[in-house]
């Protein structure tokens, strides 16, 4: 298996172009990545494995840039995904464009989102808290069933995200009351 650099991951998992002071400019190809996933990969899996392919049984989840992509997928492809988990989503990449997508997304009833971040992530807790709170508020205005958490002592790491799995699964698996 070929290992990808962080820069390639930032390009593939960002639906938007963005500039990072540390790493430079990125032409986000996340829209193409998710289009491939929706139109090629998911149909292949549904044809070759015993799945429940309908929207009600199709969830997506990820952390960091994968969390950003999961949030993007829930909004952009809500006819495919009913639920998503976005652990430490990289909403800093393009908060304005993501907020615009939240505002114009065609959302089905019963859409569910779990979203969190750790209180010890990345060193800019105040900025992250404000961006996270703004995104949570915007999502809730659209009627998405949201569970959000700021994880005390949580860091931007696999070890921290692993501890959030019980909360994430509880949110994704419960019945939604309309």
Regions found by a protein language model. Give the residues of each.
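Non-catalytic cap/lid and distal C-terminal segments of serine-dependent acyl enzymes
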Residues: 1-178
